[in-house]
C-alpha cells in the first residue's frame, strides 16, 4: 500500500466483515487520507458522484458489471487496486482494460490499474485541425467598392439573333447536304424521304395511256390530275404531296 501514500480520499469495497476495521485502518495509515467503506453487494445501489475518489480498493471480488461504474467514480489518474481476487488474473485484466482503465499491472495476488488523466466524455482540440490564417482573411475582403456588371452588356447584337434552324444540324457543317454515319439530327431521314419521293416521281406511269391529253381523259386517281396537258413522253415533275397517302 506504500505506492498509494498521499492520496486524499479512498473507497474500500469489502466482502468479508471479519477484521474489516483493521484493514480500513491499515489503508488510512498507508494513504494518510480519508477512507469510505462500501459492501460489494451494495455497490450497484450506491449514489457516489463522479470523480469522487483517488483510490478504490476491492477485496476478494470479481466485479464484472461494475468496473465501468468504478471508472466514473475515480478522479482522473485515480487508482484501482484489487487483492485476493477470485478468478484468473488474465480475465480480470481484460475486463478492466475493456472498461477503460490503462497502465494495468499484475503483482502477487494483486492487480492495479489507472484511470486516464482526463474525465470520461471530455474532448480536446486536435492540433492538425488548425485553420489556415490566410484562408480566413479572404472572407474579410470587403466587396462594397466592387461594381456590378450589367448582364445586357455581355451580349452583342449578333448573340441576340436567332440562329437558322437549318444551321443547327450537325451534318450541315460539311457544306454539302450529306448525313453523317450516325446521324441524329434528322437530316438522314429527310434526305431518305426526298429520295423516295423523287424515285416515285420517275417511276410514275400511265395505266390508261391518256394522261397527257388532259383532265377530261384522266382517271379520278390519276397523279397528273389538275395539271395541263403535255406531249407524250415528256417528263413531268409531280408535286411531292401527290404521291403521298392522304390517310
From Swiss-Prot:
A GO cellular component entry from the record: mitochondrial intermembrane space
Region (Linker): 129-160
Residue positions binding [4Fe-4S] cluster: 208, 211, 219, 222
Annotated stretches, region: N-terminal SAM-like domain: 4-128
Residue positions of motif Cx2C motif 1: 208-211
Claim: Cell cycle is one of the keywords in the record: no
Cross-referenced InterPro entries: Anamorsin, Anamorsin_N_metazoan, CIAPIN1, SAM-dependent_MTases_sf
Keywords, sorted A to Z: 2Fe-2S, 4Fe-4S, Cytoplasm, Iron, Iron-sulfur, Metal-binding, Mitochondrion
Swiss-Prot/TrEMBL cofactor(s): [2Fe-2S] cluster; [4Fe-4S] cluster
Subcellular location: Cytoplasm; Mitochondrion intermembrane space
GO molecular function: 2 iron, 2 sulfur cluster binding; 4 iron, 4 sulfur cluster binding; electron transfer activity; metal ion binding
Residue sites binding [2Fe-2S] cluster per the record: 171, 180, 183, 185
Region (Fe-S binding site B) location: 208-222
Protein task: Component of the cytosolic iron-sulfur (Fe-S) protein assembly (CIA) machinery. Required for the maturation of extramitochondrial Fe-S proteins. Part of an electron transfer chain functioning in an early step of cytosolic Fe-S biogenesis, facilitating the de novo assembly of a [4Fe-4S] cluster on the cytosolic Fe-S scaffold complex. Electrons are transferred from NADPH via a FAD- and FMN-containing diflavin oxidoreductase.
HAMAP family: Anamorsin (MF_03115)
Quaternary state and interactors: Monomer.
UniProt remark on domains: The C-terminal domain binds 2 Fe-S clusters but is otherwise mostly in an intrinsically disordered conformation. The N-terminal domain has structural similarity with S-adenosyl-L-methionine-dependent methyltransferases, but does not bind S-adenosyl-L-methionine. It is required for correct assembly of the 2 Fe-S clusters.
PANTHER family xref list: ANAMORSIN
Family listed: Belongs to the anamorsin family.
Protein name: Anamorsin homolog
